[in-house]
Amino acid sequence: MQDLKGKVAVITGGAEGIGKAIAVAAAAEGMKLVLADIDADKLNNTVEELAGTGADVIGLRTDVSSESSVQALADAAFERFGNVHLLINNAGVALAKSAWETTQKDWEWVMGVNLYGVTNGLRAFIPRMLEKGEEGHIVNTASIAGLLSEPALAAYNVSKFGVVTLSEGLHHDLTLRKAKINVSVLCPGWVKTRIAEAERHREADQRTDFTKIDKVSVMTGMSIMKAVQNGIEPQQVASDVINAVKSNKFYILTHPHTKAGIQIRMEDILQERAPTLLPI
């Protein structure tokens, strides 16, 4: 989808971080925008900021883990603009715990946002996009943790591996139907966002009590937080996404050096050996 001008983009997690950066980049291409986020205040600020630059943009507070909330987002998008050409399933959360420390509520929260948030988006938008019959593109945000298993990120890893294989299967399903909709899966490494603070959106009694987490998980979590703080700017990721949409690129790897780790993982599998623990 090389010409984005006048096309409509829906972006979840669009109030800040990678989502906001993609929104800014899409607006610069002349796209109309529908932004969704759980944080209504930040969402309103971003919508006002973009509207101030001349962008045609609306925002809707959305809980992507809720099917009805995402369906309402789709209703609003199609009612306002008549079609959707670019769907960015981007909303995501994370927490640092080993598999045995991750509670059932933790699993439900992470999977609800990171994986079911994507499946809800696909169900709400794809049938209508197919019915319109126009050229389109879907970008699902996974992570390098969807290709490489990081320590102390049990639920996050599972959710992001899920997004990768979901996206691969989606590509096959749309190809078999000769649909005009292409797919990309975004697998960024460390990016300077607030994802390490994602638990701020949880109920207080469900947030991680770090006094009850073992020191290995705590130290690993601190290393991850530092890596995020030293990560690349979201604007670089947004540029990669726009370029991938225009060139119909499936895998979006924002950090080229991670390819070496992916190669090691493939070799581990082919050699049937234990997974190599890569540096954070």
Identify the residue ranges that each predicted region occupies.
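Canonical Rossmann dinucleotide-binding motif of NAD(H)/NADP(H)-dependent dehydrogenases/reductases
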Residues: Q2-V34
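Active-site helix of classical SDR
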Residues: L122, S159
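Conserved glycine-rich Rossmann-like NAD(P)H-binding loop of the short-chain dehydrogenase/reductase
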Residues: E29-T46
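Residue(s) in the substrate-gating loop at a strand-loop-helix junction
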Residues: S143
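Substrate-binding pocket helix/loop in short-chain dehydrogenase/reductase
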Residues: S98-A99, T103-E108
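The beta1-alpha1 cofactor-binding region of Rossmann-like NAD(H)/NADP(H)-dependent oxidoreductases
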Residues: A40-D41, L60-A72, Q104
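SDR active-site lid
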Residues: L176-Y251
